Amino acid sequence: MKKILILVLMACATAFTAQAQEVYKRILKVSKQTAADKSKSIDVRKVATFKVDELNYMAMKSKELMPDSTVRMLDTQAYAMHEFINLFFKRLSEAKKKTQKELIMARFKNASINNSRFNDMDKELVLSYYDNGNYMTQFSLDTDWVKALAEIRSKR
């Protein structure tokens, strides 16, 4: 399990040197490539799949509900999501006991569900990863990642 987490962290720790307006596109591109790369472990590919689904959902809902929103908003949310997931795996890898890991999982899940961005009523879609034991990234798609990340960072 620890090896898997370390591999996931390494895959997620891709350096982003893109300019601010390219963050969303860069994370999406790298995540799509990782999700399709059969040489990567299934767990790494599942994390990348979550990122792709989340980024596509975010863009779709932003266009639908906030047509005047800027590319910068998508970049900011995408970067915060990337940081949130990296911090999640970092803290999981640091946890020694199963109870600590369960507490970390609960804190991150709660931060994602308690910080809704779009207030989407399509719960089947929004919660498609939330209680799905097949994925480590059991987070709501309808998340304000900036707020969720701030919540997690404020509670160590």
Region roles according to the model:
Residues 1-23:
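Bacterial Sec-dependent N-terminal signal peptides
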Residues 3-4, 26, 33, 98-102, ...:
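N-terminal cationic leader/targeting segments used for protein routing and processing
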Residues 11-13, 37, 62, 116, ...:
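Generic secretory/membrane-interface signal
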Residues 15-17, 52, 154:
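Short intrinsically disordered, low-complexity segments
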Residues 19-69:
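Immediate post-signal-peptide N-terminus of mature secreted/exported proteins
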Residues 73-156:
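Surface-exposed, polar helix/loop patches in the mature regions of secreted/periplasmic/lumenal proteins
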